[in-house]
């Protein structure tokens, strides 16, 4: 509920049942990222739906969910419960605190893992927006302290080129205006809202330059919100220190060498090298933790090469451009793999295998 930018989720205060208003859903799919139980599902019509426990029957005491009524073994129950359980084959319950009780089998143990692997769909616009916004922000920040030209125009172009195509990521584009409705709790609303204001203020600052620092502030808010959008506990491969380090590092490692070349400030080059070293450390630390699930390549070695080139640029400044381009290549590959190899919490099943083999066992679930 808190993640939905369009306020399409509603919770019944009496029964606790949560459902999605199909007339409000914009189809961005962010709730499918945030849920660790595979409950929200994308529909062919562009919206997202979820089980709502047949709320038309539950409301007013007209009946119980059809699945509970139809289950021939009585394995399902619906009603008020006290306490809960956290079996190791489900996601940690403190992520969403679900009203779910799972009774494990009396004998044996369920051999399954809730961690699964997949590739995110339609992620090119997300790659473009995150990379371009980070580069635009850092160039604009640097321009406040160094003699860098065309900063308002670059900020406008990078955010517009990144944000506008990302509109299509919300499949119900005719309702995209709803993405701004949940600024109170949705990082996605904050990301898009502040990004939109950045574009507007950058455009105005072409005529009124004094507004440019305000545009930079909103750009910083947008990038910070972008980081938080992906810091989801339901997705362990994203919920990692490498995410903020790489998102911030993208701008630093690609922009500072260029800024050093344009301004003649060689002191920026060691700073870029330090950030590259931090990116290398965070990447290989993340890679080590994900080895069980996915095999990430050694493309981040490009960052090591960029670090060497940046340091050599202190002696021969034109090399800084090469260092920036090498860093950009490393960042693009890293961001592509960020979306291509995703580990997430879900329900172990046969259609999307979990990372550990499962054993056929019986369990009883009470909802």
PLM regions with names:
Residues 1-18, 22-34:
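Ferredoxin-type iron-sulfur electron-transfer modules and their immediate structural context
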Residues 24, 32-126:
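Flanking helices and flexible, charged tails adjoining ferredoxin-like Fe-S electron-transfer domains
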Residues 82-83, 88, 322-326, 341-346:
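Composition- and surface-driven signal marking solvent-exposed, interaction-prone regions
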Residues 94-99, 103-149, 153-156, 340-344, ...:
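N-terminal signal-anchor module of multipass membrane proteins
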Residues 120, 130-135, 145-150, 185-186, ...:
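Long, contiguous internal "core" modules enriched in hydrophobic/ aromatic residues
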Residues 150-201:
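Membrane helical hairpin/interfacial module
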């Amino acid at each position: 509920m808190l993640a939905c930018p369009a306020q399409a989720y509603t919770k019944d205060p009496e029964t606790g049942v949560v459902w999605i208003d199909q007339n409000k859903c914009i189809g961005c799919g962010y709730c499918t990222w945030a849920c660790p139980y595979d409950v929200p599902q994308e529909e062919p019509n562009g919206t997202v739906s979820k089980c709502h426990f047949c709320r038309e029957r539950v409301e007013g005491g007209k009946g119980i969910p059809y699945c509970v009524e139809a289950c021939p073994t009585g394995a399902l129950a619906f009603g008020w419960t006290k306490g809960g359980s956290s079996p190791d084959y489900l996601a940690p319950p403190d992520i969403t605190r679900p009203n779910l009780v799972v009774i494990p089998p009396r004998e044996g143990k369920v051999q399954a893992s809730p961690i699964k692997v997949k590739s995110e769909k339609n992620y090119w616009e997300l790659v473009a927006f995150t990379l371009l916004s980070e580069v635009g922000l850092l160039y604009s920040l640097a321009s406040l302290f160094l003699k860098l030209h065309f900063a308002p125009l670059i900020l406008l172009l990078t955010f517009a080129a990144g944000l506008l195509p990302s509109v299509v990521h919300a499949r119900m584009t005719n309702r995209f205006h709803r993405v701004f409705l949940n600024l109170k709790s949705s990082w996605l609303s904050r990301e898009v809202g502040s990004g939109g204001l950045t574009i507007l203020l950058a455009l105005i600052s072409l005529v009124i330059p004094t507004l440019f620092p305000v545009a930079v502030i909103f750009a910083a808010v947008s990038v910070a919100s972008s980081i938080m959008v992906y810091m989801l506990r339901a997705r362990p491969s994203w919920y990692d220190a490498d995410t903020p380090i790489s998102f911030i590092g993208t701008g630093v490692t690609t922009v500072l060498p260029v800024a050093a070349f344009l301004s003649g400030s060689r002191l920026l080059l060691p700073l870029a090298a330090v950030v590259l070293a931090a990116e290398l450390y965070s990447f290989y630390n993340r890679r080590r933790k994900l080895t069980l699930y996915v095999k990430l390549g050694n493309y981040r070695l490009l960052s090591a090469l960029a670090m060497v080139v940046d340091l050599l640029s202190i002696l021969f400044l034109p090399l800084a451009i090469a260092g920036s381009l090498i860093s950009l290549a490393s960042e693009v590959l890293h961001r592509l793999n960020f979306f291509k190899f995703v580990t997430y919490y879900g329900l172990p099943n046969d259609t999307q295998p979990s990372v550990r083999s499962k054993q056929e066992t019986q369990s009883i679930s009470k909802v």
